[in-house]
Amino acid sequence: ELKNELKQGYKEKLVDIREEIMRKRRAGKLPGDTASVLKAWWQAHSKWPYPTEDDKARLVQETGLQLKQINNWFINQRKRNWHSN
């Protein structure tokens, strides 16, 4: 009885928390096909991996990502994997 009352009282909050956790889990990884498009561009331009605005616009169209996501991916990729020497 008490257990059911508590469940009902907190049900909405528990649902909100569960949804928030699921959103956070999804963050961080791009879908494989999207990542492969970006990686292909990266490999083709490995000596100077700085896409032009036109390149970025094309990648937005090809991947369906937002421009900010494209920019962040390249920033992170350069920090983690590129040595200009």
From Swiss-Prot:
Record feature DNA-binding region, as residue ranges: 22-85
Molecular function, one GO term: DNA binding
Domain of life from the UniProt record: Eukaryota
Pfam families: ELK, Homeobox_KN
Domain ELK: 1-21
Cellular compartments annotated: Nucleus
Keyword match Nucleus: yes
Keyword set includes Repressor: no
Main localisation: nucleus
GO biological process, one term: regulation of DNA-templated transcription
GO cellular component terms, A-Z: nucleus
Expression sites by tissue: Expressed in all tissues examined. Highest expression in leaves.
InterPro entries reported in the protein's UniProt record: ELK_dom, HD, Homeodomain-like_sf, KN_HD, TALE_homeobox
Keyword list, A-Z: DNA-binding, Homeobox, Nucleus
SMART domains associated with the record: ELK (SM01188), HOX (SM00389)
Gene3D superfamilies with a match to the protein in the record: Homeodomain-like (1.10.10.60)
CDD domains: homeodomain
Protein family according to the UniProt entry: Belongs to the TALE/KNOX homeobox family.
Name the UniProt record assigns to this protein: Homeobox protein knotted-1-like 6
